[in-house]
UniProtKB/Swiss-Prot annotation:
It is an enzyme of class 3 (hydrolase). Homohexamer. Pfam families: Glucosamine_iso (PF01182). The keyword Acetylation applies. This is Glucosamine-6-phosphate deaminase 1. The modification Phosphothreonine is found at residue 161. One of its GO terms (biological process) is UDP-N-acetylglucosamine biosynthetic process. Its main location: cytoplasm. The active site is at 72 (proton acceptor), 141 (for ring-opening step), 143 (proton acceptor), 148 (for ring-opening step). The gene is GNPDA1.
Length: 289
């Protein structure tokens, strides 16, 4: 497990975006080998998405051969509703990059058979070869996706009733009116995310500090579902200083001492332009008479 500690939200967002960029470029995706990326919604990943869009517009990172799978979607909210996760992903990420719509996968909260929709989503992930990198965020109560406290740590994609804390937290997106907030959602399970070859969890802000403490310094507990990722062989937690306020000083000092090593994951920062230049140069035959 790695814990990346940056001073501010913007730095944490940029580090995460650089990491995703390097992972995609090093994977060298193509028509026969897509990079599969799990994605979250919410305010935490917005800074990361903005940097990824910037990389795309600069010609450093294409998404043509990337397939995405989103974590969750509300039940009963129209797809074109401004607060649906379809709308969120389109407005904040997908419409700004060159990803093909058929390569973006988001659960349908208006499906006739919701459990069948969840089962089909799991099959789509399998058909794509599994998730290479699943990016996630958490709530103040440590939930990841909509795996609320008490969720099974081996759960799969399913229908979930939202906890009151989550409904209250999401009311700000619905004019502050609780009656407008959906009470159910479709969500990937903890086990679904655990199946990914690598997991990166973004945790920023003092209001997430106790959840990070539970995730890092205490044992695995289904009341804090993010703690399950202690047992994943390749978990990267990316946080800002505010999120470390509940951690022990020696814990923070230990992981900060590893930053010189961990920063090598994003430095050098790879670019598709550089790889294409190297490829063209290596294909040139040396001059001969």
């Amino acid at each position: 497990m790695k814990l990346i500690i940056l001073e501010h939200y913007s730095q944490a967002s940029e580090w995460a975006a650089k990491y995703i960029r390097n992972r995609i470029i090093q994977f060298n995706p193509g028509p026969e080998k897509y990079f599969t990326l799990g994605l979250p919604t919410g305010s935490t990943p917005l800074g990361c998405y903005k940097k990824l869009i910037e990389y795309y517009k600069n010609g450093d990172l294409p998404f043509k051969y990337v397939k995405t799978f989103n974590m969750d979607e509300y039940v009963g909210l129209p797809r074109d509703h401004p607060e649906s996760y379809h709308s969120f992903m389109w407005n904040n990420f997908f419409k700004h990059i060159d990803i093909h719509p058929e390569n973006t996968h988001i659960l349908d909260g208006n499906a006739v058979d919701l459990q069948a929709e969840c089962d089909a989503f799991e099959e789509k992930i399998k058909a794509a070869g599994g998730i290479e990198l699943f990016v996630g965020g958490i709530g103040p109560d440590g939930h990841i996706a909509f795996n609320e406290p008490g969720s099974s740590l081996v759960s799969r994609t399913r229908v979930k009733t939202l906890a009151m804390d989550t409904i209250l937290a999401n009311a700000r997106f619905f004019d502050g009116e609780l009656t407008k907030v959906p009470t159910m959602a479709l969500t990937v399970g903890v086990g679904t995310v655990m199946d990914a070859r690598e997991v990166m969890i973004l945790i920023t802000g003092a209001h997430k500090a106790f959840a990070l403490y539970k995730a890092i310094e205490e044992g695995v507990n289904h009341m804090w579902t993010v703690s399950a990722f202690q047992q994943h062989p390749r978990t990267v937690f990316v946080c800002d200083e505010d999120a470390t306020l509940e951690l022990k000083v020696k814990t923070v000092k230990y992981f900060k001492g590893l930053m010189l090593v961990h920063n090598k994951l994003v430095d050098p920062l790879y670019s598709i332009k550089e790889k294409e230049t190297e490829k063209s140069q290596s294909s040139k035959k040396p001059y001969s008479d």
